[in-house]
Amino acid sequence: MRVSLRRASTEAIAAFILTFAFLLALAPSAPFTRELGVCESGAVRDVIAGNIILPHFLPGPMVHVPPLYWWTAALDVRAFGWTEIALRMPSMIAAAFTCAIVFMWASIAINRRTAFWSAMSLLTCHFFLDAARQPRMDSMLALFVTAAAIAFERALRPSRDDSSAPIDLRSRHVGLALAAIAMGLGILTKGILGILLPGLVAGLYLVVRRRIRDLFRIDLIFTFFVALAIGLSWYFAAYEVGGQKFLQWQLTMNLWSRFVPAEAGGAGYCVHPFWYFTPHTIAGFIPWSAYLPAVAIYAWRRRGRKLPEAMVFTLCWFAAIFLFFSTSRGKCLIYILPAFPPLAVLTGIVIDAAICSRRESEISAADSTVGANQAPEARDRAFAIAFAVATAVVTVAAIAFALAALAIVIFSLPRGLSPQLHPTDRRFLELFTSLAASRSPALFVLIAACSASGVAGIIGLRRRDPQLQSVSVLIVAVAGSIFWFGVLNPALAERETLRDFAREVARTVPSGNEVAHLGLSDCDLNFYSPQPLTPIYRLRCDESSSSPDFVVARKVDFDTTRVANRACFKPILESPPVDSNGSRLLLQRIP
């Protein structure tokens, strides 16, 4: 059942509150370790110091994208202090808003049940939750791209679209205005992607629907001009501050180098094959990725005019973003985040379709003869099988995990398994084993949830009840998310963080003394230090050396330094070996 705009808005506010509360339960104050966004926290320091227009990564170069994220993070630091939750807050709020507007749009354009499952599959998929806890701008970009795409759908839908109320001129103009604002904010978040991604979505949709003339409508073109004006306002202001150096940095580093091969002048980082994002998208959408074959079957069997208009748009939305990043030369994993909201909507559509199909078949069975029902049942059989198989896979996995966890609680972990794993996986397994040994309540809650999920899945499969099957997947998705991000990850962070070492360094070094860092900097060490560590790339003991009296270095780097260059430094503090880089040392120059 579709709902009115007013009611959908009220329910979206409730969805935002519940989503944000869920994110707050996932240990947002856990210590930082090696998150990429922590390396960029120096820009927040610079904004707080007063360099608002063109902040720099302290220590480091000027920012590589517009600073909307760092502006909002600076406001949160003012409110909550220099803490982990302050830097994570912008991403958490953006993620909650993304779920809320997905829910609101699906309620209006499709129905409330699709809206519920779309929002829940987005909120509880691994990739989206992980990004929501990262102190960087990607969740904000995903929010504005999602908002712009949805606004375009409201503005560009056909006048006789049966899936929602016919569009009028006022609704079209409101939709385009909202799209312009969202794209402008997207530019202020991560540059050209803020306008390019929604533009590709709208363009592909119009091409697929053979509405080529609409691409050249004055109001649509004007929408992009307004968005550019909003975004370019920062670029003009930053050029006034940074001059030619800023212009060259933006054009060469952040536009040209990311999309061309290294041999043609590109940067050559995050280079991966065309199919790179496919397995990562499937893995990142766990456990809901089990339903993707059902999504494909449903869309293929109803291709053309049989598909609801909202689903056609959502398919174009996902395809435009996914194909764009797949063809890009640089493919950093986090780039694909804006593709997850449409993927969640497709999942919600399919879950709703499975539930409706089951209910329609029950009604038909009661009112019709067997022969009259054979055609529609044959048409939907492959879809129903794919949906049931997906549920069965998740059910088996949930039961297997519950049994394995109980076995570890009772018998402990078999010897010889841990050394064969990746170091990070080994640490996770060690933490899991310690939770089992201590009979952690969180672990028993997870076991109970997986057992309940398995039971619900089995009952749903026996009754051929898609709604109960979906609930079984939701149970394990929620419980797994809370355990992974609220229990295991914070525990691992406590083991791997340099927070305590940074605080000990701050207590040891006399106030006012500069502290340097030898070689590659540790991002969390910079975050937890009272002031950014000055980077140096070699130790020197000659009298002309201007090295600070205190230097932080990785022990392996200090040990491999020439004796003549390290003879004048002595270690006075040593951290535990928290990661594969080993211990860190605080060195003091010998007078």
What positions do the PLM features span?
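Membrane-embedded architecture of ER/inner-membrane glycosylation machinery
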Residues: 2-4, 177, 298-591
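Membrane-integral, polyisoprenol-dependent glycosyltransferases
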Residues: 1-364, 369, 385, 389, ...
